[in-house]
């Protein structure tokens, strides 16, 4: 699959774990989590230090989520990504997105290689906000990325 097909397939799933969503309501991870909910996704928070996020049960690890999710957005530091990728594989999660806007984000090459070696679908980098339809700052960002030829096809 092309990168764009992987992104579209990920976003076509309805039940998605958001791994690394913060307890801090002002954190960017919460904005991302809330946007998935606003768009009708069943977003499942994963944070080992939170029993709930915005009234929804939070799980300590991907493998504890019940019922299972179809995909996982990983928004943790890259140093945690390989262990989280292994948890996702053990939990039967076949689609993972390692978030990155600037810097390294959650992208770790060992984690990406692990997932790909297991036949999992991987989006390594990028921000889901750029691929949600509609106006806004991230729509403008997506437009600019298209202009410079770096938008996935």
Regions flagged by a language model, labelled:
Residues 17-19:
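Conserved beta-strand elements of the Class I
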Residues 22-26, 30-54:
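NAD(P)-binding Rossmann-fold cofactor-contacting core
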Residues 49, 54-77:
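Mobile, glycine- and charge-enriched loop segments
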Residues 69-105, 109:
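Mid-chain, well-packed structural core segment of small domains
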Residues 101-129:
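Rossmann-fold NAD(P)-binding glycine/threonine-rich loop
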């Amino acid at each position: 699959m092309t990168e764009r097909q992987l992104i579209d397939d990920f976003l076509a799933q309805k039940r998605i774990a958001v791994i690394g969503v913060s307890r801090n309501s002002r954190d960017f991870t919460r904005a991302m989590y809330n946007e998935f909910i606003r768009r009708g996704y069943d977003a499942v928070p994963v944070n080992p230090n939170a029993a709930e996020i915005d009234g929804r049960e939070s799980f300590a690890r991907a493998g504890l989520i019940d019922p299972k999710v179809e995909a996982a957005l990983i928004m943790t530091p890259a140093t945690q990504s390989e262990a989280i990728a292994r948890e996702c594989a053990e939990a039967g999660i076949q689609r993972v997105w390692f978030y990155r806007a600037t810097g390294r984000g959650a992208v770790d090459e060992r984690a990406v290689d692990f997932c790909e070696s297991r036949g999992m679908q991987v989006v390594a980098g990028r921000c889901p906000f750029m691929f949600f339809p509609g106006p806004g700052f991230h729509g403008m960002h997506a437009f600019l990325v298209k202009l410079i030829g770096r938008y996935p096809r």
